Amino acid sequence: YVEMSPTKVFLIQLLNIAGLGPVFGPILGALYGPIALLWVVIGCVFAGAVHDYFSGMLSVRYNGKSVPDIVGYNLGDLIKKLMRVFAVVLLILVGVVFVAGPAGLLSQLTGMHSMLFVAIIFAYYFLATILPVDKIIGRIYPVFGCALLFMALGILAVLLFSGKYTIPEFTSLENCIADPERFPILPMLFTTIACGAISGFHATQSPLMARCLRSERQARPVFYGAMISESIIALIWAAIAMAFWNGASGLNAAIAEYGGQAAVMVDVIARTTLGEVLAGLVIFGVVACAITSGDTAFRSARLIVADFMGLEQRSLRKRIYISIPLFAAGLVIIFCLPFEAMWSYFAWMNQTLAMVTLWMLTAYLNKR
């Protein structure tokens, strides 16, 4: 429980929930055509922002409790016990996904072995997980949060004012992906674009910042505002992906050419539209976003475990005791599962948690 300024809390919340989601997800989701833009807008306004606001606000009302405990208060002890395990597994998967993604991108850019970057990122994650929130996260994350916003605004400026790109018009609900039978809109679009529309992972991050707010009045601009901001970022990247490759058909061809690697496509877009120097800053921003979501995922997992075990977290030794098994599990996953499998499990668990959170919010409001 470390009080911080509302602006700083907002920027940290935005960075915690964003990660690679509002960049990679919309680029891949744009394969489905302009309907992806519709999903981001409707999903965010009517589901995602509501989900994020209430999960954060209820954490404030329940004195900073984590999402499994809040679920337990409203849906019963059995669901709470299941959610404890479910949330911790999801958070470990998030942490691992956001190790493998940036490590692979850094390896591609530098030519150095990806395992070196995995080791460096894991070491940083461990420090950020066990240290108080104001020591690392509170100091550098607001800077990264500003970088994320400026990165998206730079792409938007090119999209609107360069005169080179035209955003495809929304004319039908047609599935524009290359293989529509294998990848139907329902449910694949809704797991491809999660961050920017609705993501259960956000419910695990909101309690981190709920413990840093000065009053309940700050909850709406922080939690609702951060989700709206993430949705705008997602819209920008989905729009530039479609405009850059002249529609969904061109984007499908580009995906095939680059082997489905969204990181490579971000690099191509950035270098072409912004130039080498600014493109380097964009890639740095993408890597930073992924890493800053990964470390707070492990931090959230530690807090959830500490809550249900009843362990106070003032002692550094106890924080280390809880963190070691979590990181050991993460290492096992990263060495035993390919990235595609990790991402598939994460995508399913992420939206399942979002469903449970909305169920819990409905029960809470129904009681009142």
Predicted feature descriptions by range:
Residues Y1-M4, L28-G29, P34, V50-I79, ...:
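Flexible loop linkers connecting adjacent transmembrane helices
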Residues Y1-V23, M188, Q218:
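Membrane-interface "cap" regions at the ends of multi-pass membrane proteins
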Residues I12-I17, F46-N63, V67-L131, A194-I198, ...:
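Helix-loop-helix module between adjacent transmembrane segments
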Residues L20-I27, L90-A103, T191-L213, W237, ...:
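Membrane-helix boundary/coupling elements in multi-pass transport proteins
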Residues L31, L58, V97-L109, F122-F144, ...:
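Membrane-water interface regions at transmembrane-helix termini and the short interhelical loops
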Residues G56, L159-F170, Y224-V268:
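Extracellular/periplasmic helix-exit of transmembrane alpha-helices
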Residues D77-K81, M115-A119, G225-A234, M242-A248, ...:
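Loop-to-transmembrane helix boundary motifs in multi-pass membrane proteins
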Residues G95-I120, Y125-T129, L148-I177, L361-R368:
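Hydrophobic alpha-helical segments and their helix-loop junctions in multi-pass secondary transporters
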